[in-house]
Amino acid sequence: MKISVELTLLPLNDNFEIPIKNFIKKLRTLEVKVSENPISTQIDGEYDALMSSLQEVIKQSFENEPSVVLNMKII
């Protein structure tokens, strides 16, 4: 089953650009279509592969950035 996931990463500090750029770089290493806009990043792919890969990227981001919010919409 194909899905689209819209992600918005919100680091809760003044230096927010670096964590966002690192998050997007990690998403680009996945074997999925990545589309960016000023507010969010959308990824498209097969549900099982996308969600298992995305889980690791999210975990790394939370470990590297102690104060961060991630908004995720699955369509």
Predicted segments with their positions:
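Charge-rich, low-complexity N-terminal segments
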Residues: 1-75
